[in-house]
Amino acid sequence: MVSIFFVLVVMNGISAESQKDYKVLIGMERDKALSLKGITTLIIDAEFFSQEDIAQLHANGNTHIFSYLNIGSIETFRDDYADFANIALGHYENWDEEEWVNVADPRWQKRIKNKAQLLSHKGIDGFFLDNADVYYHYQTPEIYQGLITILQEIHKENKTVIINGGDTFITEAMEQNAIKGIVNGVNQETVFTEIHFKNNTFGAKPVEDRGYFMEYLAQCKTYGLTVYLLEYGATKKLTKEIKAYCERNGFTYDISPSVELDKLF
């Protein structure tokens, strides 16, 4: 039933234009990803790709290749999970393989610094940093400053940085003018759509619930950040609405058929 749902979503919802401008495919298998061509901004998890793979993706006409990097939680499938399990802060709702982590811990900050360096050496163009939302769940000065420290270290790699989510942190950091020139863009998920995790389906977010993120993204734009939207399973009608909103505001969007971000269609 789920696979049928995904097929219908693609046939009715995703425009060809959004496929080429911006694609978030951090869950796509390496062999499939290496066949991707002509995408302006492509997001992958470069930990599972070699330097030669990144060169191949560039040769395929993919202009800007960003690597996913999880700065705010620890995933159980990472090779070094056991080394950092003792600084986990709590369960990550809807994602059984993840736990929020203490970003103020110097060992964690060193881990992220080292990962950023390794990814940079593979030839990526930028970082797609996830789970700054740890500050939403644990709003302490230590967690806030831990994220700032991590961003300052990543900035030394001289790569473009997009923050996925993290609105509570980003809002405060903009108020403090702490990320000017360090963070270049934000990606916001589910402005127009919503994920129903219990039955693995998607739906349209009620209009009255969209205002918060629209206001937040307007603030990000004013601050000088490039804005990206990542939506899930939008119908053809809703896709037109998303496209019009993004065109009015100078934003870029992707509409994924899968919460795992592992397929084009």
Regions picked out by a protein language model, each given a short descriptive name:
Residues E17-F265:
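Glycan-processing catalytic domains of CAZymes
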Residues N12-S15:
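Membrane-interface motif at the C-terminal end of an N-terminal transmembrane signal
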Residues V2-V10:
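Bacterial N-terminal signal peptides
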